[in-house]
Amino acid sequence: MAGPVRCLPPVVEATSIPHAPPVISKEVSEIVNNMLSVAIPAAAAASAQDQRFASQFRCGPEFTTMKAQALEACRKILAENDQGGYTIPAKGLYPYQWNWDSALVSLGLAEMEEERAWEELDRLMSAQWEDGMVPHIVFHKPSSTYFPGPEIWGSPDKPRNTTGITQPPVAAISVRRLLEEAKDKALALAMARKLFPKLLAWHRWFYRARDPEGTGLVATIHPWETGMDNSPAWDEALARVPIDDIPPYVRRDLGHVDAKMRPQKAEYDRYLTLLYRFRALDYDEAKLYYETPFRVTDLCTNCILHKANEDLLWLAGATGACTDESEIRGWTARANVAFDTLFDVEAGLYRCKDQLTGQFLPAATSAGFLPLFAGVASGEKASAVARTLGRWLDDVAYGIPSCDPRDPQFEALRYWRGPVWLIVNWMVSEGLKRYGYGELAQRVERDSYELVKNGGIFEYYCPLTGMGAGGGCFSWTAAMCLAWLFKT
């Protein structure tokens, strides 16, 4: 298909917001656009009932054609975003290695080349600090397209050229899956044994630095640590952070993506206020915990950590790398009890908490479904969560929105305030199947398929129109297609 280089479908909704196209090769652009040119007429020909609720959507000829084209596009996207041992999320917008992005991307890379998938994880863990923390960004190469860079973070030699905060610890989850599905068992076992001590040290850091009181749930001290940066869950807690007299700055993200899809200035001012305060404390873990004006119990971080602990325990047995499993079992036992304190009976959903007030944070977000992924919900609570999810899906054209669509803070295109993210859909789908809600999981998978088919390979998607938004030719979306959506 002729046309400009893009990852957008050739026809978009009238409500779409134009933004700068991603910098991609002509080859990738043509593959993506060919994929979309086949998909859109096929989607139009199908009934809405067939599109969204067919229980065997992976069995038809349309899916077979779409699968071949999508997999080719996704492989090429990951190849183009490969910087030689690590993968960037998207060119320009995110030019470095992000923590949970790389862990999730490794799942897609494993469908292409196992050795490269292990290299992704190994490169990430090589940035681990002396205290066990794994930073949320590793600045491997200089770049002028992102702010704040390494000169702002000023991280000490632990090593240098990283940020001073972390992200949800997906890595152990990825290591287990790579080992379980490995074709090269010798390589996989050797790499799992190499990475196990680093994973264990990271998890120990979480409980030492972020749960010094032994509650069973860890704290996050910056919205960027949650991975869900501008979630409405943080509005109330973040608003109490006084904006310091921070140096003037220029946001680079707005040169790549429309401002209506990104966090607002008042949020960025507070993000940077926290950053400069943490730097002034020399990233001392005790001072950060007790002196930060923002400290929350984030469901995403805690659910992923719990699932990662479950997988770390499995890895201990599979690799023989840990002879005493009692420490890990203690973490999971305490968390299993503590998660009950995050369930909101009236909402039928789990909620994040403000650790400085002890109160629930008011916004209902997609993180509230992740206790199913972690396996910490009772049957009764899981049933309530499934009912709530069904209502959310009924309220939008495509799920899962990152915020309750009935919430006044819902914004369909603004980052984590409404858009659909395939990584969340994958985790929730896995959780639903874990609890026996296969039909609801199939519905989430079907919506995810429709989004990719009609919207391209984007960072996230509008839940009302299906339009791709944020960064284009996005690595973890491509990885989810390879490792989940089109993996049959």
Curated annotation (Swiss-Prot):
It is an enzyme of class 3 (hydrolase). The keyword Hydrolase applies. Its EC number is 3.2.1.170. Activity is not dependent on divalent cations, but it is enhanced by Mn(2+). One of its GO terms (molecular function) is mannosylglycerate hydrolase activity. Coiled coil: none annotated. Optimum pH is 6.0-6.50. It catalyses: (2R)-2-O-(alpha-D-mannosyl)-glycerate + H2O = D-mannose + (R)-glycerate; (2R)-2-O-(alpha-D-glucopyranosyl)-glycerate + H2O = (R)-glycerate + D-glucose. The active site is at D229, E459. Optimum temperature is 40 degrees Celsius. Keywords: Glycosidase, Hydrolase. The keyword ATP-binding does not apply. It comes from the Eukaryota. Substrate binds at Y94, W98, N99, W100, D101, Y146, Q167, G227, R262, Y415, W416. InterPro entries: 6-hairpin_glycosidase_sf, 6hp_glycosidase-like_sf, Glycoside_hydrolase_63, MGH1-like_GH. One of its GO terms (biological process) is protein N-linked glycosylation. GO terms for cellular component: endoplasmic reticulum membrane. Catalyzes the hydrolysis of alpha-D-mannosyl-glycerate (MG) to D-glycerate and D-mannose. Can also hydrolyze alpha-D-glucopyranosyl-glycerate (GG)with lower efficiency. Belongs to the glycosyl hydrolase 63 family. This is Mannosylglycerate hydrolase MGH1. It comes from Selaginella moellendorffii (Spikemoss). The lineage of its organism: Eukaryota, Viridiplantae, Streptophyta, Embryophyta, Tracheophyta. The gene is MGH.
